């Protein structure tokens, strides 16, 4: 019987526009396809698993002898953000999109926030995080006022220089914002965005922290935890689920740390799930339209993936997917509404398998629920029985 699932989310690595992408301004987007096309990178490990069988990729070939199961998944939820994507992977469909603020946050929200933190704020508009600290960083240093901004996603972001507003105080401000932002203004995430440096040379640090809404219903993580299984969160997973359904967690500063932490978790978890988010694709490269950086990050993951695969036992199942797109070749810097890849591998698989087009990310949750005999997850369809696993596993 399968005993462990290693679930890795390559944050923002979408594989082509969803049929309704035009409604989100994302017609023609294809994060992975465009990055591969522009850079000519090769991804031999994921090619071996069947990545090139999911969509046509210029320099990643289809593999008739793929050792993994492969397919792509559509997002059923109404959105294209991190919280929505991860919650759906865990079995929760978000039918009403989280609120967004293209004109900035309402006066009453900002006034309440300023009153609670005891100081004014700067910004209060949609902006790129790197651009707004360039624009307002110097004024922030002079005044001590935090920079509040949003994006096309449902986020309330607070940027502050670590020497002006210490991290613990910034995190406290985020907790205050999280308390205020409820009801009609229940944004998906409040995000701390600390930075360092001097005017003209500001750099965001790895001390970002996300303060998510609590999931509005049970996820497969809750079901696993209640049944006594380990749920080991790596990266920002604990934040995305507001700690719900998590038994152990480690926060990481970048993809490399996330991969290493996943490998270390494989020594700590005997029965249960390791759930990893690798954020650099999205945060460092996608939102900054850095195509070459995105390609290097994909290549680096592909080069380190064998370290994980070689540690897999017959009772382990590896699932690699994504939560949305963030096509760095588009003029915009926001997430894109795309299909996500699905790669599944176990040493106990006899051959590769085409898992086709899945109607929802929640198929991952349904599969995990079936493996551990929890649930059921009614929002998705398990693909466990479609996997060519050896008898008795």
From Swiss-Prot:
It catalyses: 2-deoxy-alpha-D-ribose 1-phosphate = 2-deoxy-D-ribose 5-phosphate; alpha-D-ribose 1-phosphate = D-ribose 5-phosphate. Binds 2 manganese ions. Its EC number is 5.4.2.7. Pathway: Carbohydrate degradation; 2-deoxy-D-ribose 1-phosphate degradation; D-glyceraldehyde 3-phosphate and acetaldehyde from 2-deoxy-alpha-D-ribose 1-phosphate: step 1/2. Keywords: Cytoplasm, Isomerase, Manganese, Metal-binding. Mn(2+) 2 binds at residues 282, 287, 335. Its cofactor is Mn(2+). It holds the Pfam family Metalloenzyme. Mn(2+) 1 binds at residues 11, 323-324. It is found in: Cytoplasm. One of its GO terms (molecular function) is phosphopentomutase activity. The keyword Lipoprotein does not apply. GO terms for cellular component: cytosol. One of its GO terms (biological process) is nucleotide metabolic process. Its main location: cytoplasm. HAMAP family: Phosphopentomut. Belongs to the phosphopentomutase family. Isomerase that catalyzes the conversion of deoxy-ribose 1-phosphate (dRib-1-P) and ribose 1-phosphate (Rib-1-P) to deoxy-ribose 5-phosphate (dRib-5-P) and ribose 5-phosphate (Rib-5-P), respectively. This is Phosphopentomutase.
